[in-house]
Structures are given as C-alpha cells and as structure tokens.
A protein has these predicted regions:
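Noncatalytic, solvent-exposed loop/strand surfaces
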Residues: 1-142
C-alpha cells in the first residue's frame, strides 16, 4: 500500500514516475493544491507530498487519523476517532493550525471503537459535519 504516479503517453504508453509509501491513505482522502498532495498517511501522520517528485515536504502527528476537505485556502481536517476538527493552512512550509474544536455531542449509535468517516463540507460559508444521525452546521465566513 502506498502511492504511485504514472504518466500516460500520447501513444497510450505508460511510464511509472515513482512508487513509494510516503502517502498511505486509508479512507480520509487526499487533495491536490498547487502541485502538492495533502492528506493523512498511515504511520506518518498528516502529510504534504510533492506530486511531481513523490517526496514528503512535511508531516505532522498533531491530529489523529482522519479526513480532509479544502475551502478558502484552508484545510479542514477531522480526527475519525475523537471527532476533533482542525482548521490548518494549505501551506508547503508546514502544519500551521488556526484553531480546533471537538465535535460534540457525538452519536450514541456508534460502537465504542467506531469511527467518524464522513467528510467535512463547506457550502456558502457554512461548515457541515455529520456523525451518524447528527448534523452540525458552523458559520465559517470570513
């Protein structure tokens, strides 16, 4: 498990540019911004990876494994275990946190070892988060 970058030629040829374990994403997704991938990599933590070279630009374990969303030059990252949500910069200089909070209350439907696998969504300046039957809306307009 890991990541691989391939290039498709005009003659339908395939060239492998790299294959490594720098971004081992599970279900949290990754996003591409300015030639860099952002996401959670198992064992490494939150990671910024150069798409062209495959090299890790930075990594951080300041938040547990989870999902990611991008809006207004910010990363919305949510820890799937604790429900902690972090607003961070989409920046190649490192993990820059602008705030965090814990999603509460949390569902009673989820088993104790269960996870929150829904992705954050921002629409019209409102951040939407869901945990089973619970839906949360936060005003995140500038």
């Amino acid at each position: 498990m890991g990541c691989r970058k391939i290039t498709l030629g005009s003659d339908d040829s395939v060239q492998e540019d790299y294959s490594n374990r720098n971004m081992k994403n599970h279900h949290g997704g990754v996003l591409l911004k300015g030639g860099h991938l952002y996401g959670y990599s198992d064992g490494r933590g939150w990671t910024c990876q150069n798409l062209k070279t495959g090299e890790v630009v930075w990594d951080s374990k300041k938040l547990g494994k989870g999902c990611i969303f991008y809006a207004d030059n910010r990363l919305y990252c949510m820890d799937e275990g604790s429900g902690t949500v972090v607003l961070a910069s989409a920046d190649t200089k490192g993990w820059k946190e602008h705030g965090r909070f814990k999603l509460e209350p949390q569902t009673e439907l989820r088993k104790p070892a269960g996870r929150i696998w829904t992705h954050p969504v921002v629409s019209n300046g409102v951040l939407y988060l869901r945990d089973q039957e619970l839906l949360f809306a936060f005003d995140v307009k500038k």
